[in-house]
């Protein structure tokens, strides 16, 4: 399923191609690209649920103290190792994520089929969430820089 999400993000969203495609057409294209029907359905459902998070009717997306500390459940810790949880905290500290977008990221991660997530995959989920969260354009650009900038090995310029 994650491969399909990456395919869609790279071919439609990130390439700035107009994303006004009929779901049936999209399913056919993904099938032609070699993806299995069951995985396509899961990926499209994942994206639909991401869009629904914008409505903010989930209790964990409302009424948070701005400087609250996130305690992860055991299931979340099983899926997100220490490195991934640390990266989420880092993103909050540099204000790429706020309380709401952090919870959206965790929600979407928990819906992925993967039993554990690697840091690179987490970065892409964050980018997908920020892209779909209105008002987070600056955070999206900052996250894009974190993903695509390659360190040149110098500590000082």
Swiss-Prot record:
It comes from the Bacteria. Transmembrane segments: none annotated. Coiled coil: none annotated. Belongs to the Smg family. NCBIfam families: PRK03430.1. This is Protein Smg homolog.
């Amino acid at each position: 399923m994650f491969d399909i999400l990456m395919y869609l993000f790279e071919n439609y969203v990130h390439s700035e191609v107009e994303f006004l495609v009929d779901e049936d057409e999209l399913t056919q294209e993904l099938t032609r690209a070699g993806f299995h029907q069951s995985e396509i359905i899961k990926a499209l459902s994942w994206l639909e649920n991401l869009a629904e998070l914008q409505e903010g009717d989930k209790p964990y997306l409302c009424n948070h103290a701005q400087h609250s500390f996130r305690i992860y459940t055991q299931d979340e810790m099983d899926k997100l190792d220490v490195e991934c949880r640390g990266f989420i905290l880092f993103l909050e500290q540099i204000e790429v994520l706020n309380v709401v977008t952090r919870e959206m990221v965790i929600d979407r991660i928990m819906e992925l089929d993967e039993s554990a997530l690697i840091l690179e995959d987490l970065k892409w989920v964050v980018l997908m969430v920020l892209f779909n969260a209105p008002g987070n354009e600056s955070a999206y650009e900052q996250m894009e820089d974190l993903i695509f900038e390659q360190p040149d090995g110098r500590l000082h310029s």
